[in-house]
Curated annotation (Swiss-Prot):
This is Apolipophorin-3. One of its GO terms (molecular function) is lipid binding. Transmembrane segments: none annotated. Equilibrium between a soluble monomer and a bound lipoprotein form. Apolipophorin-3 associates with lipophorin during lipid loading until each particle contains 9 or 14 molecules of apolipophorin-3. One of its GO terms (biological process) is lipid transport. Keywords: Cleavage on pair of basic residues, Lipid transport, Repeat, Secreted, Signal, Transport. It is found in: Secreted. Gene3D superfamilies: Apolipoprotein. Its main location: secreted.
Length: 189
């Protein structure tokens, strides 16, 4: 999930930056600027709330929610990787290379999370760090992707923008659900 978020965020950043490159670019760039702004705020809020939840007194409930959340994050990372694969077939040049690199990094992040997954209850702190690192990696990949895609804005905007926006929206919705479940488990009396 975190890797998906990063890739989507990077794509959004790239699209919003590329919209600024040309003065005659369509006004549609504003949607990507809003998406980029939202992604930055979401990442900050997610990290802050996640860190505060780790100090929960309901350790058993929180660890279970963390394990369940990681299951759904892994599913979202797979879905995000599939979305990127679909976008790759519509892209060309540097945009295609950037999408492929982002997809590979998302899959690598998912694999690292998958390896840590069985030990969630035993090592919740280390797993928390891996989950947060996955979010950070995804954001960094999204920023790289955004820079690459920006150079091919017109074509990218027509073909990839709807796919990237949908993937981003799906990721954020899912991440908010996981965050809510973790919060409920941590504050359970």
């Amino acid at each position: 999930m975190a890797a998906k978020f990063v890739v989507v965020l990077a794509a959004c950043v790239a699209l919003s930056h590329s919209a600024m490159v040309r003065r005659d670019a369509p006004a549609g760039g504003n949607a990507f600027e809003e998406m980029e702004k939202h992604a930055k705020e979401f990442q900050k809020t997610f990290s802050e709330q996640f860190n505060s939840l780790v100090n929960s007194k309901n350790t058993q409930d929180f660890n279970k929610a963390l394990k369940d959340g990681s299951d759904s994050v892994l599913q979202q990372l797979s879905a995000f990787s599939s979305s990127l694969q679909g976008a790759i077939s519509d892209a060309n040049g540097k945009a295609k290379e950037a999408l492929e690199q982002a997809r590979q990094n998302v899959e690598k992040t998912a694999e690292e999370l998958r390896k840590a997954h069985p030990d969630v209850e035993k090592e919740a702190n280390a797993f928390k760090d891996k989950l947060q690192a996955a979010v950070q990696t995804t954001v960094q990949e999204s920023q790289k992707l955004a820079k690459e895609v920006a150079s091919n804005m017109e074509e990218t905007n027509k073909k990839l923008a709807p796919k990237i926006k949908q993937a981003y929206d799906d990721f954020v919705k899912h991440a908010e659900e996981v965050q809510k479940k973790l919060h409920e488990a941590a504050t359970k009396q």
